[in-house]
Amino acid sequence: MFSLAVLREAISILRGIGIVESRHGSGNYVSKDPGSSISMMIKAMLALKSTSKAEIIQVRKVISYSVCELIMDRGLTKEEVADFQSILDGMITASKEEFAEYDRIFHRKLMLLTDNTLFRTLMEPIGEAYLELIPEVIGHTDADSRKALVDIHALLISGLVDHDREKCKAYFEKHYGFVEDGLEL
């Protein structure tokens, strides 16, 4: 049997890491957004240099490939393909700042298509940390480089539509190679 003091301490720790939230006069509840605590932890790890940009990219690459595997298993609807094409069209004419936002929208849409709440909860904070690096990468690009990035993103959609794992793998090598070069890793 636990003492009340031990239970309070455990709840305090869970609240501190964002898993539990306390509502005055109502009690303690499991947080609806545990991903935010993971995101804060990743940012702290970066600030304390206990992780690196390269490690974030490595984890993101593995997770992104898993996202694509799940999407290939379920397939893309014509409407989803059209949505991605609209994002790609926006990327073509976008400024550097707008391009980074379109990239965020593109990758978030991929993540949401997994239809897996736990996967999204785990991936979103890593994606946020990764996407904070994108403006730095885009900042080093010219119009031709951004056009090449649009083509790389189009390759992924083509791979997903065709259920072609090799195309998707080629996308990941090109995309993350571009990111690593932009961050000079």
Whereabouts are the PLM-identified features?
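Hydrophobic, amphipathic alpha-helical faces that serve as interaction scaffolds
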Residues: 47, 59-76, 104-142
